[in-house]
């Protein structure tokens, strides 16, 4: 199932990303920035973006939440 809104994304969610070759990998949601919402430190992002982390500690930034699939 794909996300319909950035508001549905929760910290710690396990998501599946598919790369250009069709290979799917699991990631954890580390940070979810929503356009126009200010966080606790006063940062307000200009675009939606989600920062993911994989099993090896590599971080990946996703700008289009519809690319991620929810692991149920």
Please provide the spans of the model-predicted regions.
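Intrinsically disordered, low-complexity, charged/polar segments
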Residues: 46-72
């Amino acid at each position: 199932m794909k996300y319909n809104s950035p508001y549905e994304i929760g910290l710690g969610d396990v998501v599946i990303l598919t790369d250009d070759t069709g290979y799917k990998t699991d990631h954890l949601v580390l940070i979810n920035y929503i356009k126009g919402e200010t966080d606790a430190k006063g940062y307000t992002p200009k675009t939606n973006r989600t920062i993911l982390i994989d099993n090896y500690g590599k971080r990946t930034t996703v700008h289009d939440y519809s690319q991620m699939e929810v692991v149920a």
